[in-house]
Amino acid sequence: MYTDTGLAVRVIPCLDIDAGRVVKGVNFENLRDAGDPVELAAAYDAEGADELTFLDVTASSSGRATMLEVVRHTAEQVFIPLTVGGGVRTVADVDLLLRAGADKVSVNTAAIARPDLLADMATQFGSQCIVLSVDARKVPVGSSPTPSGWEVTTHGGRRGTGIDAVEWAARGADLGVGEILLNSMDADGTKAGFDLAMLRAVRAAVTVPVIASGGAGNVDHFAPAVAAGADAVLAASVFHFRELTIGQVKAAMAAEGNTVR
């Protein structure tokens, strides 16, 4: 059974990085180069972000080498925890990212094909370093239902796996991951709020921290996610396009009685 530890709710901006550049658009007026992940990470750090997540969306091996450089430079300038994910397939991948300066590594598709990978990673590096990223959606009408009604997806939510999302999160926790990054593919990009029902279901199934992702659109969306069981809230475009600041999100959560840093 999960019990709230009373820790501060973490606010986490997420940056998608392709060949060393931030993609999906960023609109920071005070930056010389809003496509530079190191500069953007430093700006979020200064603004009060509790952690940062980098998602490597590069497919090429040259892009992977570039990502390690980005992580190194970021770790030199930013002193909040950094999670890096995207294309992590092996224990060696985790080792390289941690050595480059990542504090945590998130694993997604590779673990679906080989769940024991999570146990191997947690054993070698410690549970606190390993995050299971779950891209989940409601099972489409006409597809075979899963027990919870949500399924794990791959390929940016386009391909269903038939694996129950809540059961998969619980299995990841049993295998030793230290955290679940729960991304609603239904809510992602809608700015209509987080999938609270899915958050509640996963929260009831695991004892490790859960990060809510997908759907943030205004300051009023964050406190309900915490009430539904999120230990941290992650967002991208609302921060990148300056629709919301870290401070505004924290103030809104604090006004609802949540502890923030």
UniProtKB/Swiss-Prot annotation:
Biological-process GO terms, alphabetical: L-histidine biosynthetic process
Keyword Lyase appears in the UniProt entry: yes
Entry GO CC: cytoplasm
Keywords annotated in UniProt: Amino-acid biosynthesis, Cytoplasm, Histidine biosynthesis, Lyase
GO molecular function terms noted in the UniProt entry: imidazoleglycerol-phosphate synthase activity; lyase activity
Superkingdom of this protein's organism: Bacteria
Function: IGPS catalyzes the conversion of PRFAR and glutamine to IGP, AICAR and glutamate. The HisF subunit catalyzes the cyclization activity that produces IGP and AICAR from PRFAR using the ammonia provided by the HisH subunit.
Subunit structure: Heterodimer of HisH and HisF.
Protein name: Imidazole glycerol phosphate synthase subunit HisF
